[in-house]
Regions:
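N-terminal secretory signal peptides that target proteins for export/translocation
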Residues: 1-3
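Sec-dependent signal peptide recognition
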Residues: 5-11
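Enrichment for repetitive, rod-forming helical segments
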Residues: 12-13, 59
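N-terminal signal peptide c-region/cleavage motif recognized by signal peptidases
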Residues: 16-21
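Compact, glycine-rich, soluble single-domain proteins
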Residues: 22-148
Length: 148
């Protein structure tokens, strides 16, 4: 085989392997403890583009007190969808100081956009109904290491 063809075949195999690796849930991201009032959240932290793009895709279950905190470099309008996401989720768009800007609920396997009402750096996903069951709404403040 010509050396260039070997290189192309190797590159294709590496890309195929990388793509296959995204077919499973992310379970080993760093974690942070967040609180609001007496409620404690054990949140996985997605900071890289790849981690944020995968998010909670492919998860079949998630304990009630767990979630995922998406951290972006700069505040901007953040929009989320539910492609390849099997769990119904609630999403909180969060200001730099931990104040929830707005909330939404998202249905599994849908492509509807759920967007922040203003530019934010943080987005917290929890099981659907988690925020409403705890009386948490826009204006509620989250406490924890990421927030100033």
């Amino acid at each position: 085989m010509h050396p260039m063809k070997k290189y192309i075949a190797l590159a294709a195999a590496v890309l195929a392997f990388a793509a296959a690796a995204q077919d499973g849930p992310q379970l080993n991201l760093p974690r942070v403890k967040l609180t609001t009032g007496m409620h404690v959240i054990d949140a996985q932290v997605a900071t890289t583009t790849e981690q944020r793009m995968t998010g909670l895709m492919f998860r079949q279950e998630m304990p009630q007190q767990e979630g995922m905190l998406f951290v972006f470099e700069y505040p901007s309008q953040q929009c989320f969808w539910m492609k390849n996401t099997l769990l119904p989720l609630a999403v909180a768009f969060v200001d730099d100081d931990g104040t929830i800007v707005n909330l939404d609920e998202m249905q599994p396997q849908t492509l509807n956009s759920h967007c922040s009402a203003k530019p934010v750096r943080y987005v917290l996903e929890m099981n659907k109904g988690w925020f409403s069951k705890k009386g948490i709404k826009a204006g509620t403040k989250l406490e924890g290491p990421p927030f100033k």
